Each structure stands twice: as C-alpha cells, then as structure tokens.
Amino acid sequence: MSRTWIDIMADSKPDLPDNNKKYRISSKSGILSVLRVMIRNNSQATCYFGDAGSFFPTALLNLDSQRGEMVLDYGPNEEINQQALQVEKWNVVAFPNQVKVQFSCQQIGKTEFEGRNAFLAQIPTSLLRMQKREYYRVATPTTAPVKCVIPLLLGKSPSTVEVLLQDLSCGGMAVIDSNGRSNFEEGSVYENCCIVLPDIGTVNVSMRIIRVEPADTGFVHDLQSQRVSCEFADAGENALSLIQRYITRLELEQKRAS
C-alpha cells in the first residue's frame, strides 16, 4: 500500500515519539472543538490526495456532529474535484491561529451547501494539532534554491539583503548569508521578509533570529558565510498554506528520487 504524505512526515520527524501520539487528539469533543475553530476563523486549508501529490484549496464550512459528517468547500478546478472524488482518503492541512491542524477525510462525496457545490465527508476519528516549534523542517534544494529578501533594521546599510534558504518548515527556516555583513543579531525581529517559493508563489513573513553561526559551505576559504536560524514571528494562514504546499512537493520529489 502506498504511503501518504502524513506517513512520510510522521516517520521523518525525530522529535515526535510514538508516531505522533503526543499531538494526536482522539476524543470527540476535542476534535469538534478544533474543527469549530477552523469554521469560526474561516481557515483556509489544503487537501492532498493520490500518490501524485495532487491538491486543491478548501475550507471547512459546516459540521453535523449528530450524523458525524462535515462539509468542505468545493475546489476551483472541476477536473481536480472529480479526481478527488475517485479516491478513498484525503489529507487536509490547515493553520487556524497559526497552529498546524492535520487530519484525514474518508467516505467522501459531493453535496450542496447554501446553494453551491461542496464536499461531504466523515468527521475524522482523530487529528494532529501541532504548535510552530513542532514542525518538521525539510532541506531546500541547491539546484533550484529558495531565495528570501530581508529588509534590514533602520540605520543598516544596505537596506535589504538576499539570502538562500537551507531548510524550511511552517514554523521557521535556516538561511545562508554569504557575505556575512548583515550583522544579524539573535532575538531581533525582521518584518516583511519576502520568500520566493519556486512554482508556488511569494509569501511575506516576519521572522525572529534564533541563532547565528559560521556556515559550513564546504569551501575551505569561505570565512564570511554565516548560517542564520529563524522562527516565524508572524505568518498568515495563506502564507503557511503556500509554505506547506511547497514542503509537500519537496517531500514527494525526494520520495521519487530515493
């Protein structure tokens, strides 16, 4: 049986013991509470399905706890919607209040909600709820590097610096500052940092510097480069959804190459 992306992520993350049990919610009241927050916040979600890593944007619209059913928004592409209806299980990821929520959908069908097309699925029997510090980081490729433009603090020269990402998660990233002249200080917050995700889009985040250290670039005479570890101080749900889509794509590409 093919492994889902959730299986890949759970296996890859070393600090989540017992197959994510610490972060899994299995009580009916706990599950409904998390899902209601998603509805109340109108949280944007991404639904992944199939071995090819297909996905579409969605949102949780309604819950019927008596029937054990939930309604999800219909995707914008009818061809993808029809493909999604042919599979037995979906994996849904959302970020209400910047907390990662992840669950599987089963018994999926088409319905109508408030006069428009929608999906009907069974309420999950469990879900994962993980804070930012718990996100798994994935190494970004060197062949198609991810770039980030960081506006420096007032009084700094130059006013911006472009760095290359070394790894990325929905909770933060590590970047390589090749010239080492940016004078990043641990604890400083940099706003409106622009990350360009190849074939996905551009996201803007605020980040806090966690650690600055010499970078191991593999070049003997490279004494300037520094590795800067950051956590996201502020990232909207849409930005987190785009980052998650990019991470998922990298995971699938790495799986195919292995």
Swiss-Prot record:
A GO-annotated cellular component: bacterial-type flagellum basal body
Keywords: Bacterial flagellum, c-di-GMP, Nucleotide-binding
One term of GO molecular function: cyclic-di-GMP binding
InterPro entries on file: PilZ_domain, Split_barrel_FMN-bd, T3SS_YcgR, T3SS_YcgR_PilZN
PilZ domain sequence ranges: 131-248
BP GO annotations: bacterial-type flagellum-dependent cell motility; regulation of bacterial-type flagellum-dependent cell motility by regulation of motor speed
Annotated signal peptide: none
Keyword set includes Nucleotide-binding: yes
Transmembrane domains' residue ranges: none
Gene3D superfamilies: Electron Transport, Fmn-binding Protein, Chain A, predicted glycosyltransferase like domains
Coiled coil recorded as keyword: no
One Pfam family named in its UniProt record: PilZ
Entry's localization field: Bacterial flagellum basal body
Family matches, as HAMAP family: YcgR (MF_01457)
Family: Belongs to the YcgR family.
Protein purpose: Acts as a flagellar brake, regulating swimming and swarming in a bis-(3'-5') cyclic diguanylic acid (c-di-GMP)-dependent manner. Binds 1 c-di-GMP dimer per subunit. Increasing levels of c-di-GMP lead to decreased motility.
Binding partners and assembly: Monomer. Interacts with the flagellar basal bodies.
Listed name of the protein: Flagellar brake protein YcgR
Organism field: Nitrosospira multiformis (strain ATCC 25196 / NCIMB 11849 / C 71)
